[in-house]
Swiss-Prot record:
Pathway noted in the entry: Protein modification; peptidyl-diphthamide biosynthesis
Source taxonomy: Eukaryota, Fungi, Dikarya, Ascomycota, Saccharomycotina
GO cellular component entries: 2-(3-amino-3-carboxypropyl)histidine synthase complex; cytoplasm
Gene3D superfamilies, per database record: Diphthamide synthesis DPH1/DPH2 domain 1, Diphthamide synthesis DPH1/DPH2 domain 2, Diphthamide synthesis DPH1/DPH2 domain 3
Keywords: Cytoplasm, Iron, Iron-sulfur, Metal-binding, S-adenosyl-L-methionine, Transferase
Transmembrane segments: none
Pfam family, one: Diphthamide_syn
Protein name, as recorded: 2-(3-amino-3-carboxypropyl)histidine synthase subunit 1
Organism the protein comes from: Eremothecium gossypii (strain ATCC 10895 / CBS 109.51 / FGSC 9923 / NRRL Y-1056) (Yeast)
Signal sequence bounds: none
Main location per the UniProt record: cytoplasm
Subunit annotation: Component of the 2-(3-amino-3-carboxypropyl)histidine synthase complex composed of DPH1, DPH2, DPH3 and a NADH-dependent reductase, predominantly CBR1.
Residues binding [4Fe-4S] cluster: 133, 239, 368
Function: Catalyzes the first step of diphthamide biosynthesis, a post-translational modification of histidine which occurs in elongation factor 2. DPH1 and DPH2 transfer a 3-amino-3-carboxypropyl (ACP) group from S-adenosyl-L-methionine (SAM) to a histidine residue, the reaction is assisted by a reduction system comprising DPH3 and a NADH-dependent reductase, predominantly CBR1.
Length: 426
């Protein structure tokens, strides 16, 4: 198994975990019937038919459009035909294109294609887009756009709540599935049950190898793409991942580059060994996270905030990161506890910015929980998440080294404006 280089420990990093190489992989085997039931349970249990947008042949077979698409990388699926059809169908006149910084290099090519084949004007939105929570339909509408195409993230914000028409393009990426399967077969014993997940770009590959490995005659593995609704099966976000039954899985495997999203699953499931397969470098590494340090740092922040009298309640204004219902719920609870609350709106939250609020004793941010988890140490005053604020107020379960919830955008999560409880979590 290829391993990542040993990471030199430094005081206070962005993340509290470290990546290490391991020579051995512990495996957990289950009976054939049990494992197949796990795989079957990962499949959709609904028989409802999905509405299919039939793209007209005149678009699918347009030779000029086909030639234009060749200007884009062939292993990146920008779904140009589907985009052209939707823009035409809605008769959109000004279309906003929003994508993460890594894809902006292709934005002008896509813009030219859409303007030529849709008879519309396009606006490339250059502000940072960290995830689907950053979809900025408000700014797009202010710019006079009547349609927005959001690239590389899943449908976290439903299409029926945005202020203008929206199309999500996942930008799925083709990878070497054979190499991924052989890597898993080499590192895990036959019959091992694995939870495999990744970002939305690699979701098709995960589902593809699941079936192939299940029916492999030489080295069968049981692959389960876990799901925490409303995310897709096998999808994970940096703030939202499923709590997995540790007795059912020998390990969890993340398919993707970087650690940010994987860290969510490691925080949520500290007792399950974690591995990462990078489809670009084709390296397979053992990953770890310092749960003790996480608990130590976040517990300290809560204790410091507990005696604070004046709280700055921050609504994240980067796209749709913030949730007004959650802000209102937290304000009500803080005031009921005798705290003074100052409302603040920020698109991005930086230590230097919050340091200017001298009269505020502690902050609560309704934007991204990873801001507090990853960067909380860098702020001169406590910066709590909605969950940690409820813990401080005695209205949610205290975390420990075995459990810290990462369910922010779950259907009943704080990111949805709900007030979840974690009392019954095992």
């Amino acid at each position: 198994m290829s391993t990542a280089d040993e990471v030199t420990k430094k005081p206070r990093r962005r993340f509290v975990g470290v990546s290490r190489g391991e020579n051995k992989v512990s495996t957990k085997q289950v009976s054939g019937d049990e494992a197949k039931e796990l795989v079957r349970s990962a499949k959709s249990n609904t028989g409802a038919r999905r509405a299919i947008n039939q793209i007209p042949d005149e678009i699918l077979n347009d030779e000029n459009l086909q030639e234009a698409i060749k200007l884009l990388p062939s292993n990146y699926n920008f779904e140009i035909h589907k985009t052209v059809w939707n823009i035409r169908k809605h008769n959109a006149k000004r279309v906003a294109l929003q994508m993460p910084e890594g894809l902006l290099i292709y934005s002008l090519v896509i813009s030219d294609i859409l303007e030529q084949f849709c008879n519309c004007e396009t606006v490339v939105m250059g502000d940072v887009s960290y995830g689907a929570c950053c979809i900025d339909d408000f700014t797009a509408r202010a710019l006079g756009c009547d349609f927005i195409v959001h690239y590389a993230h899943s449908c976290l914000v439903p299409v029926d709540v945005t202020s203008i028409k929206i199309l999500y393009v996942f930008v799925t990426i083709g990878i070497d599935e054979d190499h991924l399967m052989k890597t898993l077969q080499k590192n895990f014993a036959k019959g091992t049950s694995l939870a495999v997940f990744g970002t939305i770009q690699f979701n098709p590959a995960i589902h593809s190898i699941r079936e192939k490995l299940l029916y492999s005659e030489s080295h069968m593995l049981y692959i389960t793409p876990p799901q925490i609704k409303p995310l897709s099966k096998g999808e994970v976000l940096g703030c939202t991942s499923q709590r997995l039954p540790k007795e059912q899985f020998a390990a969890m495997v993340y398919v993707g580059d970087g650690r940010f999203h994987l860290e969510s699953a490691m925080i949520h499931n500290p007792d399950i060994p974690a591995f990462r397969y990078d489809p670009y470098s084709r390296k397979f590494t053992r990953e770890t996270y310092d749960q003790h340090q996480l608990v130590e740092v976040r517990s300290s922040a809560i204790e410091k905030a507990r005696n604070s009298q004046c709280f700055g309640l921050i609504l994240g204004a980067l796209g749709r990161q913030g949730n007004l219902a959650t802000v209102a719920n937290l304000e009500k609870k803080l005031r009921a506890a005798g705290k003074k609350v100052v409302r603040i709106i920020l698109s991005e939250i930086f230590p230097q910015k919050l340091a200017m609020f001298d009269h505020i004793d502690a902050f609560v941010q309704v934007a991204c929980p990873r801001l507090s988890i990853d960067w909380g140490y860098a702020f001169n005053k406590p910066l709590l998440t909605p969950y940690e604020t409820n813990v401080m107020l005695g209205q949610d379960r205290m975390f420990n080294e075995k459990y810290y919830p990462m369910d922010y955008y779950e259907v009943n999560g704080y990111g949805r404006g709900k007030q979840p409880t974690h009392d019954n979590v095992i």
